[in-house]
UniProtKB/Swiss-Prot annotation:
Keywords, sorted A to Z: ATP-binding, Hydrolase, Magnesium, Metal-binding, Multifunctional enzyme, Nickel, Nucleotide-binding, Nucleotidyltransferase, RNA repair, RNA-binding, Transferase, tRNA processing
GO molecular function: ATP binding; CCA tRNA nucleotidyltransferase activity; cyclic-nucleotide phosphodiesterase activity; magnesium ion binding; phosphatase activity; tRNA binding
Cofactor: Mg(2+); Ni(2+)
Subunit structure: Monomer. Can also form homodimers and oligomers.
Family: Belongs to the tRNA nucleotidyltransferase/poly(A) polymerase family. Bacterial CCA-adding enzyme type 1 subfamily.
Ligand binding (ATP): 8, 11, 91, 143, 146
Biological source species: Cupriavidus necator (strain ATCC 17699 / DSM 428 / KCTC 22496 / NCIMB 10442 / H16 / Stanier 337)
Name under which the protein is recorded: Multifunctional CCA protein
Residues binding CTP: 8, 11, 91, 143, 146
Record flagged with keyword Transmembrane helix: no
Amino acid sequence: MQVYAVGGAIRDELLGKPSQDRDYVVVGATPAQMEAAGYKPVGKDFPVFLHPRTKEEYALARTERKTAMGYKGFAFYCEPDVTLEDDLVRRDLTINAMARAVDADGNLTGPVIDPHGGQRDLAARLFRHVSDAFAEDPVRILRVARFAARFHEFGVAAETMRLMREMVAAGEVDALVPERVWQELARGLMEAKPSRMFEVLRECGALARLLPELERLWGVPQRADYHPEIDTGVHVMMVIDQAAAMGAPLTVRFAALVHDLGKGTTPADVLPRHIGHESRSAQLLEDVCVRLRVPNECRDLALVVAREHGNIHRSQEFSAAAVMRLLERCDALRKPARFAEALQACEADLRGRKGFESSAYPQAARLLAALEAAAAVDAGAIARACGDDVGQIRDRVQAARVAAVAARIGG
């Protein structure tokens, strides 16, 4: 049998980028031969094995045939007569359909095997599908969009974009399971320029099917004095790119993505104002989170940011009592780390505006100082001092916290 490293590891080597892991394909072997060599079977849908020493995954070369809609609708053939070329032709993009042989020590040997012009497309900075079999797996639309967020200087070949549009029109993306959609969106949000993912999804029509709440933001105007970029969709893309530039975690990036969904439902006769968009945003994102089965930690932070980002922006003008009420609505005393992430999302929101990219955000330091002061109040001591008058405990703790906040930040 012969082992090859395939896909991303070869692509990244040619780009001079580090590769986090390698994918291996084994040609000319049976499952029994792999187990006899010490490999442990782990694949459910097709034969995948763990290397006895490195624990890396090795898959038998395979072909696949479409049997139903969606990304699970495939039958696989994994016999020893499947060649490397047979395996590579089923892959999504030419830049991911290259291979190099691997020796017994795991070292890459020999030339790059590139039957589909992957090196040509790397040089041209293009995402191009290998064959029309691309259309059989709708997840590939999401993967192309995610790759665009990682390799943001790349474009999508015209024929590939045309095929993606045909897939969307045929309803292929409608068959995707929510968990897989979320997985790909989350991975794309964590790339260097997540806005590119959504640009590609918009261009092929998939965003309107997967996230219509986000799609409808494009073309919705905002007040030019607050948003020189005007267009709400453009603003949100600037915000998620700012969150990425700040190195923010997924929770913050998702909150940045969905914080203004309510602006897409603002009545036309009140534009470009968006009165009450915060509560509408919260309702819409709850629907999104249910539909895509978004993790609770992402949903919870996004709800805080959607509801309170306007107040957080204005908090420099707040009295100590108003700041304390804001902290309570955000549950900041019980969840200070989440509150810090909310402030990071709000900072990205401010900077995600034309001309504001390098602006300071003093609101964050002031509110964190207020939170620190409020948290230092000994609520237990106050409760004990109240004795049997338990009805006074809440009011006295609140008064002590407001006084502590006022002493720290004024007001």
